[in-house]
Amino acid sequence: MCQRIGGTVMDYTKSVEKWGVFEFYSEGTTAGNPFLERSITALFESDSERKTVNGFYDGNGIYKVRFMPSFEEEYHFTVCGNFSDRKYEGTFSVTPPSENNHGCVKVHNKYHFQYSDGTPYYPVGTTCYVWNLQSDDLIAQTLETLRNSPFNKIRFCVFPKSYCYNSREPRSYPYEGTPVDGSAITEDNVWGYGPDSKGNNWDFERFNPKHFQHIEYCIGELQKLGIEADIILFHPYDRWGFSTMTAECNELYLKYTAARFSAFRNVWWSFANEYDLIKNKSIEDWERYAQIIVESDPYDHLRSIHNGNQFYDHTKSWITHCSIQRSPEGTSEWRKSYGKPIVIDEMLYEGNIQYAWGNISPQELVRRFWEALCRGGYGGHGETYIDDKAIWWSHGGELKGDSPERIAFMRKILEEAPDGGLRPKNMEWDEICVVPEDENLADETGYHLFYYGISRPGFRYYHIDDNNIYTVDIIDSWNMTVENVGSFKGRFRIDLPTREYLAVRIKKAGDEIE
């Protein structure tokens, strides 16, 4: 229930679960430009943590601060700033996390991930660039599709997108103002509309809170489904001028976005989609923007920057994992080069559009997922089947392809492997293989996963060691079958069905793989 203190409406969350979102809000001044000239900051303290958090102006005279507590304790907070001539204090309690709340995803075992509570997290992502800026009905359909999909991460943008099959106007814009008239845009002329298109009239120092409120709704709905929100902060596909704002406006945007979104446990920061195609931003700019997010996000969410033609220097300390656009055959080498988790977020898309990046077969996309996995990394899904209403890669809606159920099968195989992720192991020259990243688990379980891709061997010889008995499964990654073919010792031959997309799983007999 709202409180009124000296004529000012104020309220805050009295109880929140661990890794949930606490929120304080209060009326404040509307004089001048509150987005630019007003501040609200809170100090949160418990027995085990102390954090200072920046808040934001949410429009209509309301200021907010959000906080994600990491301990089941009593917290005290103090709120101050020039949004008001008052200082506010209060306490709230933090309860145990609910069943599906595992906290934030963090890097684990150098090349892999886990949640805050130690639960393993294996990214199986998809891309829907502006699903969040579609109609209510289409958003609801996307969420229902995701509910029944194998995907536990989704990449999407804050800014709308102008591109092939993306000529319609978004549901909202991030700033106050008016857009270029898009009524005459077609698939034939959409490329003629760029960030300098005449007719745009924006105030880049005044945000549209409703745009951000809606994205927060989408983040929250993803959280309910256990899906990570990989938020793309900048991209080059723009007819409104959002990609060519001044550095000062970019910095204001980053601080505002971090203040609004950071308290959601499922947020990841993707600084750009195809950073190198945004020609007006230098490496020095990207480094400065990265530091703004690092300083503005008190929870240290995962951070990456996605490439077009040229990789970013992923050795930079602010980059937590590599977000890559390439075919996955280089995964093992990227692990060596960067010493970080490898997530190949774009490996081309299953579909039938005219462009080569969007018309590979489902068999090829599934092969790429397995190649990424069996080279020690993680793949990303996308789908571009022609549809007058919605194409998954950008708008969401329904999945039409044949790869998702095979990706779900691969995810099951991955989750059955020993915890802690898998690393590449050199075996024969013409095969790829992964074993547990943890050397003790590798020795204890003897787990090996081989993948043969487009090769069609009729048999293979294997030799793990001479002392242990190993059980062998033949996995058909396309037909989604697992066949146990017995137990073996020493050097042994396994007859295979002379089909593409086969994997072979070997582990010590009698061991329960956990």
Feature annotation, model-predicted:
Residues D11-Y12, N33-P34, N352, L365-G486, ...:
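Aromatic- and carboxylate-lined catalytic core of secreted/periplasmic carbohydrate-active enzymes
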Residues D300, K316-K389:
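Catalytic-core region of carbohydrate-active enzymes that cleave or remodel glycosidic bonds
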Residues G7-S48, V53-F56, T91-P97, D430-C433:
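Non-catalytic, glycine-rich low-complexity segments
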Residues S243, K279-E284, I353-P362, H395-G396:
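Short, flexible/disordered intra-domain loops and linkers
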Residues E99-E329:
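Active-site mouth of glycoside hydrolases
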